[in-house]
UniProtKB/Swiss-Prot annotation:
This is IgA receptor. The lineage of its organism: Bacteria, Bacillati, Bacillota, Bacilli, Lactobacillales. C repeats lie at residues 158-192, 193-227, 235-269. A motif (LPXTG sorting signal) lies at residues 353-357. Residues 79-88, 97-128, 134-166, 174-201, 209-221, 233-243, 251-267 have a biased composition (Basic and acidic residues). The gene is arp4. It is a peptidoglycan-anchor. The keyword Secreted applies.
Length: 386
């Protein structure tokens, strides 16, 4: 379109130089005339509006002015003819034609560049549309992915809230269980401490009872040794009786007294064995039960005291009988010298008891019984102290 307009605009190139010059001059003059006509017409419009009856005068003025313009036009045409004859003007016209030709070439180049620009612009717009489509698609995918992630996060949030509620409830239950466990642990520790103390007391009591039992066993052994010595003495007395008929009466009394003493000693030994068995039973009960009530302690103490009192009375009676027996045996010393020798032999066989330091008599001594009774009393006393 631009090239067609250019061709139309510059179609006067085919005209001759003079004709073109005249046309240019006419165009210039016509333009000037038109401008003047327009100015004059603008100036005339107001008077016509003011007075419609004065138009002949104005018409005559216009005719006059038209004539003047024609004269001016002729002057310009003459000036144009003079210019065509001027070599400098012709050179300028040739240069003008070259410039117009180059302008046409440039215009063609501009059209090609414009076409390329439009093609590039179309490609750019296509790429932009494609990029926009891809961007919209990517945005939709990201939006969808974001919504899915949001839904997933919301589900996880709800799950975490439920888990937190469950965890809080479980933690509260565990706290209660832990508190109960701690309380039970404290009770068990207190009970364990109590049992430990009771065990220490029981061990101490058992050790004391063991020592008492050992002392009782030692006393029993000593009593059995005394009994064996008495049995040997009795046998020796029987032999002495066969040897000395002269001292038969005295020996008979001594033998009878010895038999009575032996029976008493055997009875006392049996009673001491029963006491020892009772002490062993008591020790066993203490080991199994580990504790006695106050009532049982009182009963046991009263029983032991009663038995000790009875045993002491019995031992006192035996001591009196032994004293009487010794007194009765003194006058018969001259009649039976062999019996005296036998008694002196018995005296030489006397031993010292390691527990009390007393001299062992041929009969049951008070020291042995006292040891057994003291062992029972000591065991009871230690248990009460514990």
């Amino acid at each position: 379109m631009a090239r067609k307009d250019t061709n139309k605009q510059y179609s006067l190139r085919k005209l001759k130089t003079g004709t073109a010059s005249v046309a240019v001059a006419v165009a210039v003059l016509g333009a000037g005339f038109a401008n003047q006509t327009e100015v004059k017409a603008a100036e005339i419009k107001k008077p016509q509006a003011d007075s419609a009856w004065n138009w002949p005068k104005e018409y005559n003025a216009l005719l006059k002015e038209n004539e003047e313009l024609k004269v001016e036009r002729e002057k310009y045409l003459s000036y144009a003819d003079d210019k065509e004859k001027d070599p400098q003007y012709r050179a300028l016209m040739g240069e003008n034609q070259d410039l117009r030709k180059r302008e046409g070439q440039y215009q063609d180049k501009i059209e090609e560049l414009e076409k390329e620009r439009k093609e590039k612009q179309e490609r750019q717009e296509q790429l932009e549309r494609q990029y926009q489509i891809e961007a919209d698609k990517h945005y939709q995918e990201q939006q969808k992915k974001h919504q899915q992630e949001q839904q997933q996060l919301e589900a996880e949030k709800q799950k975490l809230a439920k888990d937190k509620q469950i965890s809080d409830a479980s933690r509260q239950g565990l706290s209660r269980d832990l508190e109960a466990s701690r309380a039970a642990k404290k009770e068990l520790e207190a009970e364990h401490q109590k049992l430990k103390e009771e065990k220490q007391i029981s061990d101490a009591s058992r050790q004391g009872l063991s020592r008492d039992l050992e002392a009782s066993r030692e006393a029993k052994k000593k009593v059995e040794a005394d009994l064996a010595a008495l049995t040997a003495e009795h046998q020796k007395l029987k032999e002495d009786k066969q040897i000395s008929d002269a001292s038969r009466q005295g020996l008979s009394r001594d033998l009878e007294a010895s038999r009575e003493a032996k029976k008493k000693v055997e009875a006392d030994l049996a009673e001491a064995n029963s006491k020892l068995q009772a002490l062993e039973k008591l020790n066993k009960e203490l080991e199994e039960g580990k504790k006695l009530s106050e009532k049982e302690k009182a009963e046991l103490q009263a029983r032991l005291e009663a038995e000790a009192k009875a045993l002491k009375e019995q031992l006192a009676k035996q001591a009196e009988e032994l004293a009487k027996l010794k007194g009765n045996q003194t006058p018969n010393a001259k009649v039976a010298p062999q019996a005296n020798r036998s008694r002196s032999a018995m005296t030489q066989q006397k031993r010292t008891l390691p527990s009390t330091g007393e001299t062992a008599n041929p009969f049951f001594t008070a020291a042995a019984a006292t040891v057994m009774v003291s062992a029972g009393m000591l065991a009871l006393k230690r248990k009460e102290e514990n």
